[in-house]
Design a protein with these regions (language model features):
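Conserved, single-site charged/polar hotspot
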Residues: 1-389
Length: 389
């Protein structure tokens, strides 16, 4: 191992790498594009294996200035005392460390099949090792957009997606999902693939809309978006039955009205009973039906009735329990065939906010990204982000 002090350990580098204190995240950020974002990559692990394209790993304890250089793969484990972290058998006193894939913050570091710029932070928690990617917000977008939209799509659609994703991420920085991270890398927030998904057209879309966000009162809103709405988008309040204050307006969607995405799937009744934790001995006889729909045709609640009891479940919760890949949206009808429930529907996703296929259609028909965003987020503004940390 070789110890050395990196010359760029100054406030700017700290901000760029996300090595700021919690107090630092509340200070005014002069350069919005350098705002550090904390993306959850994994948690609850007993061991983590990290590599880099340069075959070098730089490691730093959170409360130290010195970085340790390792060659090749590093294996991170929990110490026998359960209070510290070890790397390749070397004990580190801290319960949290930073890792980078080279001397520059842009050098990618590898975990599993993903490559990530910025830094990785590994924290020892009661549940195991938790790992986040600390990365400047605009750099995050380079590796995030392809996870949600095809880079070959119309440029104005890509720009609309960039602004929506940037706004969502900035909102989550201010309203983090967890004390240790702002958002997750999967469909629970925004799909983030990392550096290997970067593309020239994505970088153009990011740079040409730099700092632009969807706002209300000069603050970023929570910009939901989805694949296909099926003809109309839906109010967030109706979908999640909560006090969601943004995305409360349903709008017609031209593309989905003309080219609806049709799907169908079948689920055994006992599978639904199982996820709802209803005893299987109470399975028969049963009746399952749509309790009510919204004005746009989306199912709000499902009613399940047996001789013993009655249940109702929010349709979006049911999608989550049965799998989003199975029940693709809440725009569906039900049919019972003996002990099998058949779903037949249209659209894909929760239906709230921007419809991505609708955005593509609008872009193909000459609409700008600002016009696209104004259609799906009516009554909100598109403006340059104002520092609000």
């Amino acid at each position: 191992m070789q110890l050395f002090l990196l010359s760029f350990l100054c406030f700017y580098s700290a901000l760029l790498l996300g090595l700021t204190t919690s107090a630092g995240r509340n200070e005014v950020v002069r350069s919005y594009s350098n705002t550090p974002l904390r993306v959850l990559l994994d948690k609850g692990q007993q061991e983590l294996r990290i590599k880099s394209a340069l075959n070098l790993i730089y490691v730093k304890e959170v409360d130290q200035e010195l970085w340790t250089k390792f060659t090749g793969q590093v294996v991170i484990k929990i110490s026998r005392s359960k209070k510290n972290i070890t790397i390749n058998g070397n004990l580190f006193k801290s319960s949290a460390i930073y890792l980078r894939g080279g001397p520059q913050h842009t050098d990618p570091i590898q975990y599993a099949s993903g490559f990530y710029r910025g830094a990785l932070k590994v924290t020892l928690t009661p549940e195991g090792l938790l790992m986040t990617n600390i990365i400047p917000l605009e750099s995050y977008l380079y590796g995030q957009i392809a996870g949600e939209m095809n880079p070959s799509w119309e440029m104005e659609a890509l720009k609309a997606q960039v602004v929506a994703a940037r706004t969502y991420a900035m909102y989550m920085i201010k309203h983090p999902k967890h004390p240790l991270y702002d958002l997750e890398k999967g469909t629970g927030d925004q799909v983030y693939l990392g550096a290997q998904s970067e593309a020239v057209r994505i970088k153009i879309a990011v740079e040409s809309t730099r700092d632009q966000v969807v706002t209300k009162g000069s603050l970023p809103i929570k910009t939901y978006y989805h694949s296909r709405c099926g003809g109309f988008t839906e109010s967030a309040k109706l979908v999640w039955n909560n006090s969601e204050k943004y995305n409360r307006t349903s709008v017609p969607c031209q593309y989905c009205q003309k080219f609806p995405y049709l799907w169908k799937t079948s689920v055994k009744a006992h599978e639904i009973f199982k996820v709802l934790k209803i005893p299987l001995e109470k399975l028969k006889p049963f009746k399952i039906s749509i309790a009510n729909k919204s004005s746009t045709g989306r199912v709000k609640e499902i009613a399940i009735e047996t001789d013993h009891e009655k249940h109702s479940i929010n349709s979006e919760v049911l999608r989550h329990l049965l799998g989003y890949a199975n029940v693709k949206s809440t725009r569906f009808d039900l049919k019972i065939n003996e002990d099998e429930i058949q779903f037949q529907g249209t659209g894909a996703g929760h239906g709230v906010g921007m419809c991505q296929w609708g955005a593509q259609f609008l872009a193909k028909n000459g609409k700008s990204y600002r016009e696209i965003l104004a259609h799906y987020y009516p009554s909100y503004k598109i403006e340059s982000a104002q520092p609000y940390f």
